Amino acid sequence: MALKPDRNIVVTDISNICNIAIEKGEVLVFSVSGSGALNDDVATVTRASNPSGLVPAGLSLADMVSIDITRQHRNWHKDEQLLGEKLPLLTKGWVVTNKIASGVSPAAGDSAYLTSNGNLTDTQTSGTPKVGQFLGGVDADGYAKVFIDLPIV
């Protein structure tokens, strides 16, 4: 589980396609190609191994899964989308997530920066984009409350 149910969603974006398996709570970036109109691959989002210089698209509110729907039914009670479908992304609001880089100990008020693999950190390295602000430290289970504030693109 990468997101706890305690959250406040102000603005979401459901116009982008994701073609890789991801967990809820990961911050994704815009792919370098296209717009996504007509369900093509141009407005795709992806997980960045090095987010330096990339534009964050939002925090994933659903899991992207790769299942064979001809062999099993989709579980509509889970927050999951199939690869190649539109993905709901949080662009403004706060969530409680465990997608925090290892060894990071943020405090309330620290800026939240995107680091590798969709995780968050409180230290900015060369070119890593700011995605919001930590609203508290990491608890005993590894979760932290984070306010995401991304410009509408």
Regions found by a protein language model. Name each.
Residues 1-153:
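Surface-exposed, low-hydrophobicity beta-strand/loop segments enriched in small/polar/acidic residues
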